[in-house]
Amino acid sequence: MRIPCLFKREAVSSSTAAWLAACLLLALLGGCGQQAEAPVTTQSSPANGWPRSIMTAKGEVVIERPPQRIVSTSVTLTGTLLTINAPIVASGATQGGTAITDEQGFFTQWSDVAKTRKLQPLYRGEPNAEAIIAANPDLIIVAGTGGDSALKLYEQLNLVAPTLVVNYDDKSWQELATLFGRATGHEADAAAAIQRFDSLAAATRASLVLPPQPTTALVYYEDDSGANVWTGASAQGKLLMDLGFTLAAVPDSVKGDKSMGIRKDIIQLSGEKFADGLQGQTLLLFSGNAQTAAQVKRNRFLAGSPAIKAGHVYPMGLDTFRLDYYSATQLLKHMQTLFRGNQAAASEQGKAETNPASRG
């Protein structure tokens, strides 16, 4: 196995090269042996901004030159690397062939991009150090949080290549793109993707007629036992607030023990106080579809929720569990359809109220 070297090489100056050539000629003629050696100079100034220092959850990481073979151990972070056209060659994956993944275990929102770029799946689920190392990476990306974290392999992987440990529970995909752009030299690609998305987000916000506020954004458990509520630190929460939504507060009295101090992006609700945590006048169901919305409405323990009583329960799509450029773009388009429809409905309702023929 070849371990890539990212250390700087010494550069020979033009004057030294000329001297060596002259010395070689004299040696052939038998007269260079007693000449004094000229000093060899090294290039000390960074070339085009390299090397670069990136501060991570594990401290400072120095990347000597632009990486050419990036390996992502986090399927959540892979989408953002694809977004900025980073040279990612392989990625960890998750269970394949589900409602949100393709047969390789990659998320459906960027599956086609992964296939076009011939991205290789390394493993599914449990991180595999041998598979990661065999991909011959010159930069390794590790999630510091979440179910796809390979943090336990950090010490081993960091011996192979510079390893960036990145927490995604408190960052939007834009923040991740900016970080990865600097680490890979793809700042321009990151900035362009963010600009495209921001333009779409601004147009979306201008077109929306918001449902009643505040809003509870959540991922509903399939067994009806609880939910994860997105906080303002989550990518989902940040996007909603950018669009003008107000996030409903979750009372401390109903937060689960695991919600305290471990993850910043979610609050876990379950048990008899589950319903008390759903304070929003509107429920947005992330990683949910129409069937999920119907299931939530059937849960008799949630019947007293103001959003359910008023019928303000909206599925956001199955691919919104992890927001990257691709899924967030699809979410914006979905919301344009969903809540622009409210505008049309309001218009029709206004016509009905002013049309005597429509009254019973």
Locate predicted features.
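Proline-aspartate-enriched helix->loop->beta-strand connector
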Residues: 129, 133-142, 162, 274, ...
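Bacterial N-terminal signal peptides that target proteins for export
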Residues: 3-20
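Charged, glycine-enriched surface loops/patches
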Residues: 150-188, 294-315
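Bacterial signal peptide processing site
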Residues: 32-36
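Basic- and aromatic-lined ligand-binding clefts that recognize polyanionic substrates
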Residues: 69-81, 192-256
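Structured C-terminal subdomain patch of bacterial secreted/periplasmic proteins
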Residues: 182, 276-360
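A short, structured surface patch at a secondary-structure boundary
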Residues: 78-131, 144
